[in-house]
């Protein structure tokens, strides 16, 4: 229990606000702010926790993993920030060359950590994703490098992202009206 509390505290100490996520009123709507993490992406909420879980587990087992992730921006930046400098973990981030925003490119490529490897792919996000899927499908290869992922195929990430929906539900005082969550999304991983 103490270890879990320490992991959570460490994970969210990098956020700009004590409350990792906040509810604010905008007119007659309530908005859940998810941009207070180090990369300004909602994915920081799950990635920071996931990075700390990986580090804790791997240090206790004295094992190493190689995380491979495909991104068009936010996932890569959030994953790199969560994994950079952590022992026993390397992260390989595949993104489409010249098809991400300047800020996302800078967040992903200007670090100097020995465990972060950024790979620009000639193609689009689907090409990056297909490469990652092919690596996972090659069981001999993926097990030989102890490969793991942090894209939305990772259930620990999805669970960590789900928490803020429940958290916000319980913070909303007036439940006389139905509560609807509206999420701008490029794919299911945003939800």
Explain the meaning of each model-derived region.
Residues 1-191:
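PLP-dependent amino-acid enzyme catalytic core
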């Amino acid at each position: 229990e103490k270890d879990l509390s320490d992991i959570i505290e460490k994970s969210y100490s990098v956020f700009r606000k004590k409350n990792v996520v906040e509810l604010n009123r905008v007119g007659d709507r309530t908005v859940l702010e998810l941009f207070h993490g180090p990369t300004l992406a909602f994915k920081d909420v799950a990635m920071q926790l996931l990075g700390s879980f990986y580090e804790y587990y791997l240090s206790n087992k004295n094992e190493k993993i190689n995380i491979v992730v495909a991104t068009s921006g936010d996932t890569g930046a959030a994953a790199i920030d969560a994994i950079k400098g952590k022992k026993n973990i390397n992260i390989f981030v595949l993104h489409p060359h010249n098809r991400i925003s300047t800020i996302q490119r800078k967040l992903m490529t200007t670090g100097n950590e020995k465990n972060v490897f950024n790979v620009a792919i000639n193609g689009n996000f689907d090409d990056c994703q297909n490469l990652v899927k092919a690596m996972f499908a090659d069981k001999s290869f993926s097990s030989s490098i102890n490969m793991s992922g942090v894209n939305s195929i990772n259930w620990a990430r999805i669970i960590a992202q789900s928490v803020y929906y429940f958290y916000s539900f319980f913070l909303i005082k007036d439940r006389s009206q139905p509560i609807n969550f509206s999420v701008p999304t490029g794919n299911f991983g945003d939800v």
